[in-house]
């Protein structure tokens, strides 16, 4: 479908849902495939964090840091289930209903008063981070991040983990993901969280460094006891 619009792509070698575009990148948003919801723009590493969710999803699914909705769309496509999308900044999700409609995804955008404690079988948290895993294609990010901003991000990530964990029902799963390669934002956050609670266990952890095939990323899957 992309080739009809002069866009040349090939399958990604390790992420089954991803395509590597070698020609016509700027044409994608004007292509028929994009406008009828056959393709979305997303780094392969972001897709990989969803594809590796080899877990049982018993109960509603919540994308807790939905932003523009990339992960919500990926979750919907992979799990083929309705997705609840939430973001502390509701305005960030303004385009999500149209994106969901275009792709045929069943995504319901919700506000904070719609959230329910101990209710969701899966809560996915793609938390705000330094973005260090994507500095290969956005090197200015490395120089614009101040120490104060970084420390603020660490506190925010810790708070998101604490809040999101209360929304997961017993035997449910919590996914913590970043596009960072810095330990403080990744493994250290999970270790701190597990140290302060007896209700959770680490099921899976994955770290990937940046390469020509995708950004660096981290994710962990936690299970509530």
Question: What is the role of each PLM region?
Answer:
Residues 1-225:
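S-adenosylmethionine
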């Amino acid at each position: 479908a992309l080739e009809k619009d002069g866009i040349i792509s090939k399958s990604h070698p390790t992420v089954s849902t991803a395509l590597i575009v070698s020609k016509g990148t700027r044409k994608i948003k004007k292509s028929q495939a994009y406008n009828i919801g056959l393709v979305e723009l997303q780094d392969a590493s972001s897709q990989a964090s969803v594809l590796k969710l080899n877990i049982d999803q018993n109960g509603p699914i919540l994308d807790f840091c939905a932003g523009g909705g990339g992960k919500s769309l990926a979750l919907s496509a992979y799990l083929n289930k309705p997705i609840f999308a939430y973001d502390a900044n509701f305005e960030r999700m303004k385009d999500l209903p149209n994106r969901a409609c275009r792709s045929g995804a069943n995504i319901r955008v919700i506000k904070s008063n719609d959230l329910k404690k101990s209710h969701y079988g899966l809560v996915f948290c793609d938390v705000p981070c330094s973005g260090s895993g994507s500095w290969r294609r956005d090197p200015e990010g490395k120089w614009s991040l101040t120490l104060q901003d970084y420390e603020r991000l660490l506190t925010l990530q810790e708070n998101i983990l604490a809040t999101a964990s209360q929304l997961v029902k017993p035997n449910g799963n919590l996914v913590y993901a970043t596009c960072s390669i810095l330990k403080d934002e990744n493994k250290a956050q999970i270790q701190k969280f597990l140290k302060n609670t007896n209700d959770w266990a680490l099921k899976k952890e994955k770290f990937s460094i940046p390469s020509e095939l995708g950004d660096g990323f981290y994710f962990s899957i936690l299970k509530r006891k």
